Structures are given as structure tokens and as C-alpha cells.
């Protein structure tokens, strides 16, 4: 009887852990298709160093822009960072980093340690600007064309499949 109870408990725990593991893939949960084709709002964003502001309409000067919402305390952001470095080498793409609810010193240290893929770095200490972009967690990444039209939104860390998809889009 004790053996049956132990096996039942073990099977139940395996079921629970499997369910939790499968639920971690948030890309399947959130539908990002409804924002594809919409234009981002024209807003003023404060640069990370407080030197001036950046107006989103300025991205019309670039063929493609990738907005990446990140923080130094975010483990998945650390995981995707090497992929942002790869993408930053593409001449058709400018990456704008939006530092989300982060400590400025720690954010600087993160970029010194991991490399800085950002053409422009924005600060968002309260997360307000990120919410205006429809971002509710990090990392999230939004690919925009020069008409300010959203081409793709990625929820979670960019992986190699995402990098290849972005490269394909920006080299067409």
C-alpha cells in the first residue's frame, strides 16, 4: 500500500512539473499578430544619459529599427544579449535599447560586461514608456520599418530562430 501511495505521489509530481515547464513558453500564450501593421506612436523618449530626448519619428531615417526592452536584473535579457550583438552588425538595422525599471549603474556595468549593441539607449525608470509600446514584461522586442509600422513583436528572449527571421526581413 505504501508503495502504491509513493508511486501515485511521484506520478502526480511529474505531472505538475511537466505542466509548469510547458507553461513557461510564453510565446504560445500571447498573440502578437493583432499589432502587426499598426504604427507606433510618435513620442519623446529620454536618452539614458539625460543629455536630450529622442523622438520616435526620427526612426523614419533608418530602414529598420529594433526596439529592445531590457534590464540588467533580467536573466532572460542576459541570455538574449549575444543575439542582439549579432544583429547590431547588420547595416540595415538600428537597435534602440529601452532600459526598463533599472538601476543606472548596474545597467552601465551590464553593457560594459556584455557589450553594447544599442545605436540609441533610452531610459524608462518607471516603465511608463514601455507600457505605451504595449510591453508588459521583459525582454520584449519590436521590429519597426521606416514608416513606423510594426512588422514583428517578440515576447521573451530572442533566440537564433528569431535572429535569422529578423535578418531575413531586414535584408529584403
Predicted features and spans:
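Short pre-active-site segment immediately N-terminal to redox-active cysteine/selenocysteine motifs
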Residues: 63-65, 69-73, 137
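Conserved redox-active cysteine motifs that mediate thiol-disulfide chemistry
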Residues: 69-86
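Conserved Rossmann-like nucleotide-binding pocket used by diverse enzymes
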Residues: 41, 70, 96, 131
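N-terminal targeting signals for export/organelle localization
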Residues: 1-46
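Thiol/disulfide oxidoreductase modules built on the thioredoxin-like
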Residues: 112-117, 124-171
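Conserved segment of the thioredoxin-like fold in thiol-based oxidoreductases
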Residues: 89-90, 94-126, 138
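A short beta-strand-turn-helix
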Residues: 44-65
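Hydrophobic beta-strand anchors of alpha/beta hydrolase catalytic cores
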Residues: 66-67, 95, 141
Amino acid at each position: 500500500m505504501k508503495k502504491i501511495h509513493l508511486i501515485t505521489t511521484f506520478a502526480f509530481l511529474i505531472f505538475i512539473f511537466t505542466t509548469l515547464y510547458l507553461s513557461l513558453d510564453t510565446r504560445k500564450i500571447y498573440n502578437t499578430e493583432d499589432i502587426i501593421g499598426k504604427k507606433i506612436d510618435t513620442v519623446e523618449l529620454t536618452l539614458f544619459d539625460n543629455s536630450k530626448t529622442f523622438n520616435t519619428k526620427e526612426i523614419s531615417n533608418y530602414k529598420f529599427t529594433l526596439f529592445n526592452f531590457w534590464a540588467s536584473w533580467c536573466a532572460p535579457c542576459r541570455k538574449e544579449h549575444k543575439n542582439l550583438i549579432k544583429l547590431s552588425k547588420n547595416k540595415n538595422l538600428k537597435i534602440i535599447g529601452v532600459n526598463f525599471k533599472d538601476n543606472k549603474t548596474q545597467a552601465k556595468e551590464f553593457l560594459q560586461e556584455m557589450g553594447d549593441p544599442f545605436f540609441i539607449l533610452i531610459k524608462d525608470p518607471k516603465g511608463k514608456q514601455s507600457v505605451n509600446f504595449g510591453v508588459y514584461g521583459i525582454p520584449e522586442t519590436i521590429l519597426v520599418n521606416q514608416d513606423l509600422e510594426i512588422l514583428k513583436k517578440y515576447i521573451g528572449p530572442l533566440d537564433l530562430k528569431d535572429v535569422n527571421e529578423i535578418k531575413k526581413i531586414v535584408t529584403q
